[in-house]
Amino acid sequence: MLAVNIPGLKSGELVLDGKTLGDIYLGKIKKWDDEAITKLNPGVKLPSQNIAVVRRADGSGTSFVFTSYLAKVNDEWKSKVGAGSTVNWPTGLGGKGNDGIAAFVQRLPGAIGYVEYAYAKQNNLAYTKLVSADGKPVSPTEESFSNAAKGADWSKTFAQDLTNQKGDDVWPITSTTFILVHKAQKKPEQGAEVLKFFDWAYKNGAKQANDLDYASLPDNVVEQVRAAWKTSIKDSNGKALY
């Protein structure tokens, strides 16, 4: 999610869209009262303050997700910078880890940075709304993250890119954490126990995930995962382990 430190603005009061966000990270938009931002925020008094862009100094999955989103919604970003866990950033201060970005945003008036939702919530950072693929401002919440997973097509791969998904109340910069399991299990007893554990986690882990400020997978996605276990994960004789 996008964390900001803009004096006079409340959390969730500012709205950005992908094109404008990309232009901020390209260094083209330099002040918070730029016309592109004011058009998205009628009635909001924006300060004539320099934007302090904050990004990751180290390689990260968070940067991969963020830049993948920008490459989808900003053509200039796609052609000049692209997507990756590390990129040649056009501008910005580099923070190490989510905590490094959070610390910069907290200290610097006018700052904007991208962090995991949990870091922003636990550090009481103000957030922006973001215009979704459906053209509506959306707030970052566990529900809007789950909605991104709910509407995705998981039929071909579970390594889904959930950025800029269409649907009602979908946060456009969403990603999943996933686990790799060998389809052919050389130690089937251990493999079966691993699947039992993850099955237990799906049944019982939603509250723990939410308590840690993560979103749980929607039921329809979990059922697709279980179906894949039944058809794909087998022992050396071709017997299913789940």
Q: Language-model segments: what does each one mean?
A:
Residues 1-242:
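Flexible loop/hinge segments at secondary-structure junctions
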